[in-house]
Amino acid sequence: MKKNKSRSSSKKHFVGSEPGSRGKSVGLRIIGGKCRGTALEYSGDHRVRPMKDRVREAVFNLIGPDVRGRHVIDLFAGTGALAFEAISRGALSATVLEIHFPTAEITRKNIDLLERRMPGCRESIHLITTDVFFWGQKIREQDPGYPHVNPAVLPPEIPWLVFCSPPYDFYVSRKEELLLLLKTLRETAPANSLFVIEADNRFHFEDLQVAISPRKRKSYPPAEVGLFYTGTAAGES
């Protein structure tokens, strides 16, 4: 698997000092589906911010059975909990993006944990250690050297489920890059693809320039979550 490095960090996950400072191990688990109850590896590193269990559960309650049959793209994956929750609940496959090599190794261990509960699922999960913004640039350029990182090579009839849960500060410090990344994916995604955006109250969902139903906007302080679909009336309902 080709691994790409970039000077810019797209890590959710980095809110502090140099790599190496670690917190104690903290519990993280799959909440629903075939792998329900599976404990995931997570170091407790203060620079890694997985979506809280209660928020993840609420998000998947909003998505409901619509998770099934989709290809998941987890943009700022960290431990991979969002992608793995979706796989457990019936998603077909996943592209998992993580820039930090030590964190990606933990994610790889979590794939092994899922494999024990769902034999064969490892083959459907593609972990890429790369900068998310660099990856998005390659998709915009339709770079033929990166077909393995480009979800556009998937069968066009398979809709996506895109999770965007970056460091909240990115909505301020890298706002334009984030909006461009999401615009690129929105324009590339098959019809009826579903985007799940987690931010805090510094971000205005109107900046996405998509219609999000009030029923698909939820607040779980400090998290604000919005869901929208592409290419169908569902995104406007």
Predicted regions, residues:
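Class I S-adenosyl-L-methionine-dependent methyltransferase catalytic core
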Residues: M1-S237
